[in-house]
Structure formats: structure tokens, C-alpha cells
């Protein structure tokens, strides 16, 4: 379970909008509560190194490209949601699929491919059984149905509390030489999650 700071990248993802939209509380036609939902992704070290090289070459793709396959010797794809700012402080729920387990299930595949592929297969099976439902987003699908198909391919299942907040491990390495914009009174403010030039 990730219980540490992850300097990930906020990636545009449909569920970031649809989950926030689904959890919005309305009163008299006006939204009185709308949670902030973000999709953050932290690539593997080798992928970050490649991204830095790409930036260094002004985003010109290299002539020779390759996708790592069987060369991957260890890793896992930890996928889930960290629900924050409630009586439990933080709660992590998700899955942890190792490269070893994914290759045991389907040789020559990696954990990310496995998680995406089984989700698509489960959704396609639901679509075949429910052709009159029209266009749906992932949140519209019955999670019990999807997980019944997907769970054997998702690795270890995790659901447990965490004492993590964005300020738990906060240190100011340039104390006295910068002015970080953090809110120590309310750790759940978005500014406490941002990594800025002032940090």
C-alpha cells in the first residue's frame, strides 16, 4: 500500500471527472459539495529517465524505440484509490499485481497490460449481455459484475486505513530561501499536494 509521498504526474482521465460528478451533492439545483478527484500516475524509474531524455531533446522522438517486455525482472502495478480527509484520515483500497503473477497468468505480459486488458474484457462481456444500455462510462457498469470477472487477474487485494496526509513527511529543504504555500491547519487543501518552484 502506498503510504508515502508519491511525486506522480496528474494525468487527464475520464474517471477524474465522472467520479467527482457522481459524488456531487445537490441542493435546490445547486452543487453544495463536489469532491476533488485526480488521477495521478508515477511511472517506473526507467520511464521517468526516458521522459527526461525526451524533454532534453525538445520532445523529438528518438529514431529507435522499444517497449520493455520480458526484460522487466521485477516490479508491480499498484492501482487503487486513496480516500482522504475523513474520520479514518486516509483509506487505501486497490490491488497490487506483480510482474511475476501477471506472467504466471499470461506469459510475456506485464502487470499494467493485464489490469487494463481484463477490465476491457469484463466491460465487453457486460456490453454483450446488455446491448440496449447505450453509451456508458466505466462508473455506470455494475462493479460486482466487473470484479467477479477481473479479480483473479488483479493480484493482491488491499483495503486498509493509513495515517498519511500530504504534510506527514513534509520537509522544507530550502528553509529560509523560499516561501512554500502550504496550509498546516488543514492538510487536505490542494495546495498541500502541489509540488511547486517554491518548495
Regions found by a protein language model. Give the residues of each.
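C-terminal catalytic/substrate-binding lobe primarily of soluble NAD(P)-dependent oxidoreductases
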Residues: 1-199
Amino acid at each position: 500500500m502506498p503510504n508515502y509521498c508519491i511525486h506522480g504526474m496528474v494525468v487527464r482521465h475520464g474517471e477524474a471527472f465522472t467520479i467527482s460528478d457522481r459524488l456531487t451533492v445537490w441542493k435546490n439545483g445547486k452543487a453544495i459539495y463536489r469532491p476533488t478527484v485526480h488521477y495521478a500516475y508515477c511511472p517506473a524509474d526507467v520511464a521517468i529517465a526516458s521522459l527526461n531524455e525526451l524533454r532534453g531533446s525538445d520532445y523529438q522522438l528518438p529514431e529507435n524505440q522499444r517497449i520493455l517486455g520480458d526484460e522487466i525482472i521485477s516490479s508491480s502495478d499498484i492501482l487503487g484509490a486513496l480516500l482522504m480527509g475523513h474520520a479514518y484520515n486516509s483509506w487505501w483500497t486497490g490491488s497490487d499485481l506483480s510482474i511475476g503473477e501477471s506472467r504466471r497468468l499470461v506469459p510475456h505480459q506485464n502487470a499494467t497490460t493485464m489490469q487494463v486488458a481484463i477490465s476491457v474484457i469484463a466491460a465487453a462481456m457486460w456490453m454483450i449481455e446488455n446491448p440496449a444500455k447505450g453509451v456508458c462510462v466505466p462508473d455506470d457498469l455494475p462493479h460486482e459484475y466487473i470484479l467477479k470477472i477481473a479479480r483473479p487477474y488483479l493480484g493482491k487485494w488491499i483495503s486498509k486505513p493509513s495515517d498519511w496526509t500530504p504534510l506527514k513527511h513534509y520537509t522544507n529543504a530550502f528553509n529560509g530561501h523560499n516561501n512554500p504555500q502550504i496550509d498546516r491547519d488543514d492538510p487536505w487543501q490542494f495546495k498541500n499536494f502541489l509540488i511547486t518552484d517554491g518548495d
